[in-house]
Amino acid sequence: MKTQKLFWGTLIILSLHISLFAGANDNTPFVPDANMSRADIPSIYKWNVYDLCASDEQWDKDIAVCQTDLKELKSFHSNLDTPAGIAKYMAAYFNLDDRINRLTLYANLNREVESSNQQAITRHELGLQLTEGLMQEGATLRQTILGLSDQELKNALQNEPALKEFIPFINSLRRRADRVLSPAEERLLALAGDNLWAQIDLNELPAAPEKAFRSLISELTLPMVTGLDNKKVQLSFANYGPLRHSTDRNIRRGAVEAMFGTIKSLENTFATTLGEQAKFSLFLARARGYDTVLEAYLDKDELDPAVYHNLINTVRANVKPLHKYVDLRKKVLNLDEVHLYDLYVPMVEPVSIKLDYNNGVQLIQNALKPLGKEYMKQLKAAMDPANGWIDIYPSKNKVSGAFSSSTYGVHPYVKMNYQNTFNNVSTLAHEYGHAMHSYYSITNQPYHSWRYVPFLAEIASTCNEALLSRYMIDHAKTDAEKAWLLSELLETIRTTIYRQTLFAEFELRFHELVESGVPVTAEKLNNIYAELIHAYYGPDYVMDANDHIEWAYIPHFYYKYYVFTYATGLSSGIAFAEKITQEGPETRETYLNMLKGGNSKTPLVLLREAGLDLTKPEAIESALQLFDKTVDELRALIVK
């Protein structure tokens, strides 16, 4: 799944006195060093991959057994005309699936921390090959289940008790049985690159237009611009962000104008790649009987398109707080006009807060207490390095970034590159939101219904961040610190709810062009994007000549209706954090039950049972009301 990290503090290097937080460790804290050899990092700070597999040598033996077992699955094919034969085949298939998942995760975790280790790279590739082989075998499994009539399936379940274990998988598969075509038609769609029926994440299978877009982006020749040190530098996607954040208006304006000017010169090519992507998605949707691309891609996770439209309609009805934010930015930065290049420079002087891992953990645990004793007991154990969930510090050849990854029957894993900043603390809270969601799902669901859908994935993580943000704001020691925390909260909501919803509306609009048979041109896309910018950002925001071309370099528009989940995820996380804090134990329990639900029910049912209905405005409104309130809080602090 493609995901975007949602930070509650993105720009800062933080430094509060250790004494601010309870539970400070008297021992000398470990000092992170990204150039340190992994061998020099104490083992207590490394995750325990041996909970997945006993050793590298055992991995080599186990992968060989799996390779043999994959070939032997074909021996079951001759008995798939009986319920007992189907049950034995499914048991063997999913047993192998479980073992491959563990071995693949073991290999991936090792490669993440030692990216230049050839053995780790080789094992990772072997794991991927085996996964691909099992996916190909899965076609036989799907065809077998889908080939049964309703009566045949009913009889099979009555006559073969061993099949009942697989009911969640069977029901999920057969829900879309009417979308499956004849064998000949299925073969043609597969040759065309069908990704509506993929066993893996839809967006893991890029079509040709997306590949062309990526090549175009990678080959862009960007001009020289003035850098942060006032010397000429080559503009790149890597330095564009820092330049756009510069406090020197000439520097940030120069970077934005250079980027958009270059992209504008290729606007027709970008319009072609995006238009062809939409046409291909529509072809696949219509081939399977869907009216729209939106309906097709949301159906995989049983999502009602009403969720998508509700997000857009609710945000559109609540853009005035964003207009207030633009006005506040104008006043604070003492600007005559607010342009795109003025949206990313900090409104408030960054506060410096340094926290070693132990103190960061204590801060998180203090902030998450509203989640209750059950959650906190498990979280405390999960964050204890001795229990092997986490790989904490950076080292030479360790891949940058952070993630949480899980497989059934084993505790989740969390990768960090912790360097004692509050940014890292926020990331840690986020990743443990994912990890705890997976833990609850794994320990409360059977194998076939533990893996929650991507639509739910960002809720637990952003709920944790929302609770951490509120705790920090409530316990700020100075007005300057509180102002900075408030400004970071505003920026998170602006960029994740408002901006991603604007993207979602743009994505809907250009797909509607294709669905209506209207040619997709750069002019049409530019006009749609400009109209949305005006509507969202309001009268105090001034568009420059090439601002309408921003759509052209956004990769999310090739991800087939995925970008909206960032906005719904953060909105839901904020709504849950607010409800849990204000309403107490009963709401907390319904929230934890949602985490425990895995994929046992549809995502919308799980959310409704927890108290959120994303087909209605309330959850989105809750997040935007927080934004509005925060604008007022910040204005009161910094506008004299």
Task: Place the predicted regions along the sequence by residue.
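C-terminal, non-catalytic "cap/extension" segments appended to globular domains
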Residues: 39-41, 50-54, 145, 175, ...
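Active-site-adjacent "gating/activation" loops or surface patches in catalytic cores
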Residues: 227-247, 353-429, 433-438
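Bacterial N-terminal signal peptides that target proteins for export
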Residues: 1-10
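A well-structured
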Residues: 23-350, 361, 637-639
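Long, K/E/R/D-enriched contiguous segments that form extended
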Residues: 328, 332-380, 390-391, 437, ...
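Glycine- and acidic
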Residues: 49, 244-259, 296-311, 342-353, ...
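Post-HEXXH active-site segment of zinc metalloproteases
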Residues: 427, 438-462
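Bacterial N-terminal signal peptides
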Residues: 9-19
